[in-house]
C-alpha cells in the first residue's frame, strides 16, 4: 500500500446503519467548549464528527457516532456535558461483518 493512500471515512461508515434518537442525543457538548479540547476531538474521533469551518465555527453531530468512547476518554471531564450509550434499539448497527 502506498504511504500516500487515504481512507475516506464516509465510505467506510456508509455500510453501517444508524438509528438516531433525534430528541435525546447521547453526547452533549458544554455550552462554550474549550477550542484546544475540541481540536483534540477533531483529530481523534474515528467518525470525524467534530469539525471546524473556515470561519472558525465548531460543529458536532452525534448522529454518526460509532459509540467507541474516544471523546469520553479524551475530554469527558472538560468539554462533554454528557456521554452515555443510546437508549435500547438506538445507536449504530455495524454491518461490515
Swiss-Prot record:
InterPro entries: 4Fe4S_Fe_S_CS (IPR017900), Fd_FixX (IPR012206). Gene3D superfamilies: 3.30.70.20. One of its GO terms (molecular function) is iron ion binding. The keyword GTP-binding does not apply. Keywords: Electron transport, Iron, Iron-sulfur, Metal-binding, Transport. Belongs to the bacterial-type ferredoxin family. FixX subfamily. Could be a 3Fe-4S cluster-containing protein. Probably participates in a redox process with YdiQ, YdiR and YdiS. This is Ferredoxin-like protein YdiT.
Amino acid at each position: 500500500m502506498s504511504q500516500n493512500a487515504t481512507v475516506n471515512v464516509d465510505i467506510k461508515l456508509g455500510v453501517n446503519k444508524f438509528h438516531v434518537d433525534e430528541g435525546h442525543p447521547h453526547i452533549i457538548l458544554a455550552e462554550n467548549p474549550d477550542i484546544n479540547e475540541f481540536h483534540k476531538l477533531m483529530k481523534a474521533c474515528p467518525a470525524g464528527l467534530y469539525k471546524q469551518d473556515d470561519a472558525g465555527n465548531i460543529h458536532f453531530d452525534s448522529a454518526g457516532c460509532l459509540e467507541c468512547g474516544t471523546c469520553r476518554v479524551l475530554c469527558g471531564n472538560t468539554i462533554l456535558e454528557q456521554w452515555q450509550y443510546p437508549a435500547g434499539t438506538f445507536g449504530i448497527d455495524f454491518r461490515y461483518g
